[in-house]
Amino acid sequence: MTQKLQKIVLPPVYGPADFEARVYACWEQRQAFSPRARGSGTSDSEGCDGHSRQIEGGARTFVIAIPPPNITGVLHMGHCLNTVLQDIVIRYQRMAGACTLWIPGTDHAGIATQHVVERALRKEGIHKREVTREQFVARTQQIKDSHQDTIRMQLRKMGASCDWTCERFTLDAGMSASVREAFVTLYERGLLYRSMYLVNWCPRCGTALSDDEVFHQEKDGALYYVRYPLLPRTEEEGNGVPPPLGTAQVGETIIIATTRPETILADVAVAVHPDDARYQSLIGRKVCVPMVNRIVPIIADSYVAQDFGTGMVKITPAHDPNDWDIGTRHSLEAINMLNPDGSLNDQVPAAYRGLSCAQARIQIVADLQAHGLLSREERIVHSVGVCYRCEAVIEPYLSLQWFVKMKPLASQALAAWKRADVQFHPKKWENTYVRWLEHIRDWCISRQLWWGHRIPVWYCAQCAQQTVSRVDVQRCAHCGSADITQDPDVLDTWFSSWLWPFSTLGWPQETQKLRAFYPTSAVITAYDIIFFWVARMIMAGLEFTQTVPFRDVYLHGLVRDKQGRKMSKSLNNGVDPLHIIRTYGADALRFTLAFMCAQGQDVLIEMDSFKMGSRFANKVWNASRYILGNLEGRRVYAIAHVSLTELDRWIFHTFNETVQQVRTALEAYRFNDAAQAVYEFFWNSFCDWYVEASKCSFQKPDEQEKDRAASVLCTLLEETLRLLHPFLPFVTEEIYRSLSPSVHDTTQAIPSGAHALLMCAPYPVYVPSRVDARACAHIGAVQEIVRAVRTLRAACGIDPQKAVSVRLRPSSPAQDANAAAQVSCVHDPGAVARTYEELICVLAGISSLVYLESDAPKPQVAVATAGTGFELFLVTTEGIDRTMLCARLQKAWQKARQKVQQVERKLADAQFCTHAPEEVVTAERKKLAEARATCHTLAGYLADMNGKPGPLSDSD
């Protein structure tokens, strides 16, 4: 088939703002984000778009439920990275033939959203106490709606190809049904309980937190050594009360070290280790708690660390989790000294009531000192638990809460990992997952908030029983009384999020979506929520659906600034994704993030980082514009009917190898490897070599040769656009649109009609018939000669535009020990050079290329280098600053040698060679060979200049 192409025009300047919004609108208009499906003609309210869906032809599915961003504001760069990686995978899988579904949605984010609303009210001079629960929730709904619109806009600008007809919210009606079903099911299975327990309490948020919602920060503090008066034995026996504290009355004392002197007010015991010889005689004695004159016993417990402080510790069960355990073992009273807002309550002396913990600490330390009871104070740095949202210091607090028994759920999740039902990428996170599950504690799921899923439990005032129900109830299930009250608390946000993979598909209803798309394929998220979300989703999937909710877990790094610091407003180091898009375009943003996202590592960026992605997108635009310009008026043939040159076969071979690398990398979630492979192919192999070489064909008068070259370029451009599309969807779709339908038909790349979009075209596949080692070796020899000339010109400071005279001489095995093994593959370098003389001269800027016999003398005025099987002489009549040239070559050699040593160390690491993917190890070996060849070449330059490689310098 042949077509004569009409004029194809791309604007001369790459301007992403001119087409990105239009391209995305086109995708949405054509419903390109929906799974490949057909309507059955019957109504199904559970369907994504109001119609039932049936997977066409039993195609394999690939499903991701987006990690729902919080509705508290705009998406930051971390969300952006996460979105880009998911979209790359979804676009790749869609083009690779999978029936893909990417479910978008947002999270109600209980604590965080309530903070936002309370802050907004305070700006208006309104306190939360002044509004009703219903008014507060209504105000929160308004903020939620506004922020959801912003999040949708941002995701669209990033190019997210999610199915918007399936969008969910963790507090929508369907999710509420799922949450209630999960709660009641756990209750019926005996995995839920309500108990007075010591919880992590945020006094600023006014709610309990789970262990995983407490972050730890290193803070300056003090270790206070406090004297506790020891009661005389006579008073102990008589159960006497000591006199009021005063310096004169303090007799024998014991010394206890504490970082929290304010909790002395709730002490109920002092503990020592039972094997501590220093205190054997004190076990069973009694002491007086300072400031409150409470008489408490000295007990023995093996938890006590003999090397901490003095080896004696105060026991405050209501305000320390370890003390709570000790108190439980010894049946000690738990005295709660705090109000919910963190102030001291009426369980303490009047002088301290109403003070915050920080204020009480200052006052008590002063009082201890005044009474002669503060032995000393030692400044320390210690770990302090803070709220993950507001960073207020967490207080252990005794309160009535709902808990999930986690050990039975964790055992299932561990068993699934052992069966390899779940795969972690990178694998190092498996250890973190296992360690957390093996040491898991029960999960506190109740939160003292107004925004969230209300706990579906009603308490009866008549019979004091509780009713747990999937639906709202009006009467007690036990006595029938109407005097019932629903639990005022809401559930932890993560209680809805852990159901996300299947609740988004309609669970607990057995919907067609659930049958078709569950379990999902993968979860892609940051490593910092492996506990909050990933592990819990696996447990929920196994408990409620009897299967893991996904097979692959890809945990990417966090986005930080160039100094490795977390991005924050206080540091003013944040990078706004929308600003990047406005400045460089969405494709630049996407490609840069993918290129820099190495598995298991954080991504360090700054504003200028995105120039790389911008340059690459611009390169794609300009190269495509050149190719399309040369297609005008040409007769383009189907590639099957084109006679390919060896250069053509080389580029198809190289493209073929790249396709295999990219597909392998994407299947393994190695995004940076895939991005680097497409970058290397397009910029170097395709543009710098093949497109440049094609200019020779278009400069010839032979019209048939021009048509042949145009046909190959047209095919390569179309296939390359498909290869690049998951990374650069906007620019590739826009360029593809510029290819006329006749090009599509001619290349037979995609079927006509519905799949006229690039994003719906098939992804390139590895084609064994395109492998051509001979062409690869020959063009490799051409490239080596051209690179040698270019490098030598640069080293001599010769203008790239100035033509030079070159002599090529075969090297003998004695001159080049590495050549012998490779010459058989390359054949005669001289013969290859003669075949491609025109191309070599054009690419290297050579005016005269002369071939010498192996025993010919070196030209008189020349600088030389050596390659695989040849010596190359650059003849020049101009004077060369040999000292400067030697220095330049010396520095270049040192850098090349350091590269050799770096890769050698990596390959000498048995762990790396054993555990790294085979293609990664192969790539490193290729790097080593290339680095050694560079060293060899540079050493040849130095030898020719009568210099020699010098010692290595770390600074070079």
UniProtKB/Swiss-Prot annotation:
GO terms for biological process: valyl-tRNA aminoacylation. Keywords: Aminoacyl-tRNA synthetase, ATP-binding, Coiled coil, Cytoplasm, Ligase, Nucleotide-binding, Protein biosynthesis. It comes from the Bacteria. CDD domains: Anticodon_Ia_Val, ValRS_core. ATP binds at K569. Its main location: cytoplasm. ValRS has two distinct active sites: one for aminoacylation and one for editing. The misactivated threonine is translocated from the active site to the editing site. The C-terminal coiled-coil domain is crucial for aminoacylation activity. This is Valine--tRNA ligase. It is found in: Cytoplasm. The gene is valS. It catalyses: tRNA(Val) + L-valine + ATP = L-valyl-tRNA(Val) + AMP + diphosphate. Belongs to the class-I aminoacyl-tRNA synthetase family. ValS type 1 subfamily. Monomer. The keyword Cell inner membrane does not apply. One of its GO terms (molecular function) is ATP binding. GO terms for cellular component: cytosol. A motif ('HIGH' region) lies at residues 69-79. It comes from Treponema pallidum (strain Nichols). Its EC number is 6.1.1.9. Catalyzes the attachment of valine to tRNA(Val). As ValRS can inadvertently accommodate and process structurally similar amino acids such as threonine, to avoid such errors, it has a 'posttransfer' editing activity that hydrolyzes mischarged Thr-tRNA(Val) in a tRNA-dependent manner.
